[in-house]
């Protein structure tokens, strides 16, 4: 049963069922479709609506579809880490395209959403036109990234009990977004899969990797781009992992990339 906060948050969202999970999503605008996949502890609203991405992309003539990942926002909450394997979350993305009868789409993910997008790109190359990996660079391959301490922080009795600085940041963010802390702890424990270098080279679609110049979570965009047959790196100036999301330079780079411009 959804909480009052979830009901209010999901009032304008559509829903469908997949893998026994209810997935909520926004669908706005007309034109070539782009699907937006948010990061850990975020939502479609927080990651894409509030920072102006939905408005920017619809104004550019795109149909914008943004889902709440399982365990997040108005979608179903699950408490088994195995339910959050990146490949299973990529299946939610594929099922969303099927539900909307979309043969292909552009896909943009941020942080965990970029990881999901990468798994989708590898599993369903025919369904992908172009991809944007925001807030995730070479750590997609080398496995460094969000630490296990985040799960401990989410399970702590209160924010005051969390001493780890990264854990405090994510606990505070999760509380701000009124997230289910237990579901998020399961998610962070279950979604840390990597791709091998060989698997990355099999992603043939054009990919833009955009990482903030002060991001200490994502890893190098240039190193990941060098592995991709059609990879392109973009450094978001003066931004860390959290502040890069709504950056104007990031938006401009994505619009150029989606339009096929250098």
Walk through the language-model features, giving the residues of each.
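Hydrophobic, aromatic-rich cap/lid helix
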Residues: 171-196
